[in-house]
């Protein structure tokens, strides 16, 4: 899924769109995506000027955006909510862990797996890797919200 297709599903735009491409997915199961981390990212001006590091909360946000994409693709495959405009909102995070810093030039590989959906709350296992090394992980939750045009 190209960036143009990603933008059809996610409402985020620069500088807050944190998924550059979806490399693989299976509706109802998993989604894999990448975020290319560039020195031109606006947050590097202040985090940290001497040694730029991607903020951990933005790594989690990138993973959360990937969960939204998987939720959209899953509902699309099930032919659910096709006639409604919907957003997936980030509603929870458990067991977040950060294992190493992400720096300019890194390519962040995102993988989210759907664990279950209970009463409209989608629960995912989420991992971010750089060069195969785990840099962050968490259990993330999102919920669909119908929006009016």
From Swiss-Prot:
The keyword Lyase applies. Gene3D superfamilies: Hotdog Thioesterase. It is found in: Cytoplasm. InterPro entries: FabA_FabZ (IPR013114), FabZ (IPR010084), HotDog_dom_sf (IPR029069). The active site is at residue 47. GO terms for biological process: fatty acid biosynthetic process; lipid A biosynthetic process. Involved in unsaturated fatty acids biosynthesis. Catalyzes the dehydration of short chain beta-hydroxyacyl-ACPs and long chain saturated and unsaturated beta-hydroxyacyl-ACPs. This is 3-hydroxyacyl-[acyl-carrier-protein] dehydratase FabZ. The gene is fabZ.
């Amino acid at each position: 899924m190209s960036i143009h297709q990603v933008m059809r599903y996610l409402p985020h735009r620069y500088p807050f769109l944190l998924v550059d491409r979806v490399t693989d997915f299976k509706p109802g199961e998993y989604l894999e995506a990448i975020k290319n981390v560039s020195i031109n990212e606006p947050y590097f001006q202040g985090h940290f000027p001497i040694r730029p590091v991607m903020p951990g909360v933005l790594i989690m946000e990138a993973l959360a955006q990937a969960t939204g994409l998987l939720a959209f693709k899953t509902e699309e495959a099930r032919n659910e909510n096709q006639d409604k405009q919907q957003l997936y909102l980030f509603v929870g995070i458990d067991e977040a862990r950060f294992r190493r810093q992400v720096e300019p030039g890194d390519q962040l590989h995102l993988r989210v797996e759907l664990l279950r959906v209970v009463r409209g709350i989608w629960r995912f296992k989420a991992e971010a890797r750089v060069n195969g090394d785990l840099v962050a992980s968490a259990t993330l939750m999102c919920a669909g919200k119908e929006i009016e045009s």
